[in-house]
Amino acid sequence: MMEQGVGANTVPGVTAPGNVYMIQARNPVAPGSKGQPVGMATYLTSRVTESDAGRANLQTPRVVIQNPAEVNATQGPPTALQHPTAVASLQTPPGEIQYSLGTTDLQTQPGGPQNPPTCAPGPMYTSNQFQWNMPFGSSFTFDPKKFIKDEVRTLGAIQILIGLTHIFTAINPSLYRQYSYSAISGYLVWGGIFFIISGSLSVEAEKDRSSCMVHGSVGMNVVSAIVSLAGVLLLLVDLIRNPVIDVKTVSGGLLPFVLLEFCLTCVVSHFGCQATCWNQFVNRTEVPTIVIANPANTPTGPFNATYSTTGHVNVITSSANPTSPTNAAAMVPPVPS
């Protein structure tokens, strides 16, 4: 049951359960002051919504409108809102104040007597928020270790041996008497020198891992690949066009080494180019993305508020200061009837 009384010196009583939360307005302003016109004192409204945790769904809210002892019936009626702690979320009709269990922050909007502060429903962001920084797109730098490994020294040593084989073969005078194309063109000499230089740079690059040394090794391997390709063509010409058995024997013995040199230089040049081209990602910027998560308790589902009157309680309200509106929540203990 509900009772309502209006008088100059009486405080009305409200029938409500024991768990009553009061939203009161403070800092009264006397009629006739600068903050309020003479003869017209408007108070911030506060609403009492009474609910019973034992009931499931009652759609019709019961609102008690009361006046303080100093205000007559023509002035603004203060109200208060009451809800039980057992209800997780209140789903009230449009215009009502909604609450979520575990949310303690109230968002108020500044205003005067005509625009009192109201509670804005929505997600409440508390101080205990977690933040994660998720960077997208990492900056890449040149890493010679991706190119220079233990195998590079072995490949360089093989290239040096192939170059020495070419030079030692060039000493044979019978190749020049039988008009060998590989010997007359000088491929056996300058080809062997290129192979020795590229192999030496590959071995040195394993010791000195500077970008300059790596670039030099890659460049010489590219040149050696071209030279070895030219040597393959010259040796094939000797095998096809020269009828002398000695020339065919020497050319056939060098051909596998030249093919091996071509394969080695192509492999080293390929991976070396990948290592040097890694520099194109150096100027790539890092873009972080901040993800903010609200760990506040959120309701698992909407519930309809229950409203009932089971006990007798006294409601005490005070007028509000329009210049600095504040809302305070107080719990009024039940008074036995």
From Swiss-Prot:
<dbReference type="GO" id="GO:0005886">
    <property type="term" value="C:plasma membrane"/>
</dbReference>
<feature type="region of interest" description="Disordered">
    <location>
        <begin position="101"/>
        <end position="121"/>
    </location>
</feature>
<dbReference type="InterPro" id="IPR030417">
    <property type="entry name" value="MS4A"/>
</dbReference>
<feature type="transmembrane region" description="Helical">
    <location>
        <begin position="252"/>
        <end position="272"/>
    </location>
</feature>
<keyword id="KW-0472">Membrane</keyword>
<feature type="transmembrane region" description="Helical">
    <location>
        <begin position="220"/>
        <end position="240"/>
    </location>
</feature>
<dbReference type="Pfam" id="PF04103">
    <property type="entry name" value="CD20"/>
</dbReference>
<dbReference type="InterPro" id="IPR007237">
    <property type="entry name" value="CD20-like"/>
</dbReference>
<feature type="transmembrane region" description="Helical">
    <location>
        <begin position="183"/>
        <end position="203"/>
    </location>
</feature>
<comment type="similarity">
    <text>Belongs to the MS4A family.</text>
</comment>
<dbReference type="GO" id="GO:0007166">
    <property type="term" value="P:cell surface receptor signaling pathway"/>
</dbReference>
<keyword id="KW-0812">Transmembrane</keyword>
<keyword id="KW-1133">Transmembrane helix</keyword>
<feature type="transmembrane region" description="Helical">
    <location>
        <begin position="155"/>
        <end position="175"/>
    </location>
</feature>
<protein>
    <recommendedName>
        <fullName>Membrane-spanning 4-domains subfamily A member 18</fullName>
    </recommendedName>
</protein>
